[in-house]
């Protein structure tokens, strides 16, 4: 199994304000499969993606890539895991305002041993003619496509998309 999510539990708050957000989540995903998380606002979708991506930690349970638990990885190995295997499209795309669109996409390539061609990605996403513009010169949809380009340029094994 390429990605294993096992018994993931996460809560926020304590005492009377304690809220169980994730309660024993399991999933097994092979390379090339598509898995979609559906649920209402506040149901823990973003939290689970953040745990898979190593941005947050679970209260219990584990994430494994090719059988290796991410919790057992030292910081160097976890960074390598993120660089090699993960692309992440955040709900808020957080483009760097003083870099043009091409430079914003190319940032993702620095984290890869085998990046895709920047110009080809920009053409595919309909952004090539905007490559020298700054993020604030684009529409919200164009900015989101720039964030998608940044996530896919490193040709990740796992692409986590948060809305």
Predicted regions, residues:
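Conserved ABC ATPase signature
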Residues: 134-144
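ABC ATPase NBD coupling module
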Residues: 70-87
